[in-house]
Amino acid sequence: SSDDVSYYEEISELLHATGKQDMTVSNAVQSYSQKIAEQRKADMLFGVEGMSERLRWIVNKPISRDLLREKIDLCMSTSGKLRVIYQFNLPGETERDIDEFESDVEYFRAKYTTGALATTFIPNQPSAHTPFQWIVPRYSLATQARLMDLRKRFIGSGKTGLGVYLPTPLGPKNWFSQVVAEWLPVTPTLDAAIQKLPQRAEVPEMIDALAARGVRLPAAFLARDRDAVFPWSNIVTTGDDADKWKRFEGMNRKLSSERFARGTSLPSAPEI
């Protein structure tokens, strides 16, 4: 899929050479260059994951705030259009991370009087066969409410300058149904229980709502230790991390580090 692959410069060169510059592609932010920008004929998409520099560091996409602004500047000044994909409900996320995103948007709003910037937010879903499969699923209603407030504020922004669009994020009920479908067989009983879930609730309340209708999730859904057995544990994969748990522990060390607490740019700091 060209929508969820981060192409580097070599692939962009191939697209240019074969006349495929009109494909909608996602470009690795770090490799986006003036040459690539000039070759593009379709919208560019950046998948940056975290809405702040420190969250991007946590999920192993260490894109500094300065670099992100530089690459978005390059795209906006060349084509005037860009889609940026973020995740929310990431580990360690607080109001300060949304503040940083909002500040970045205001930076571009102050700089550009025309153009379109789409900022899509996807609720984090623990990824199978990655170090992040041990992240306990959560959905912050406070974060969702803040994003919806920003969405309302951005409506009509194109009439006075740079148009910023923030699509409605997937809500907790629909998100939770996707997560549960990875853990339980989809049966009429499960479907009926899912349909009765509250529209806006956090994970513990939704788990209780399922249990009240006779649907119980395995203990490993919330208790994800090193020996947890996942629904996908019997599937053998190749070419990925040899020790995923070690990488997950590294993420936890990052979360408790001074660097994460400060949230400052330290591009030369070694990875944990």
Feature roles, as predicted:
Residues G19-A28, T143, L147-G158:
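Phosphate/diphosphate-binding loops
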Residues V105, R109, R151-G158, N252:
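Structural signal for hydrophobic packing residues in well-ordered secondary-structure cores
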Residues S1-A118, I122-S127:
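Conserved SAM/AdoMet-binding glycine-rich loop
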Residues D4-V5, E95-I98, S140, Q144, ...:
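Generic detection of long, well-ordered alpha-helical segments
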Residues G156-I272:
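Radical SAM enzyme core and accessory elements
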Residues R54-V59, F88-R96, G115-L141, T160-D191, ...:
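Flexible glycine/acidic-rich beta-alpha junction loops that bind and position SAM and/or redox cofactors
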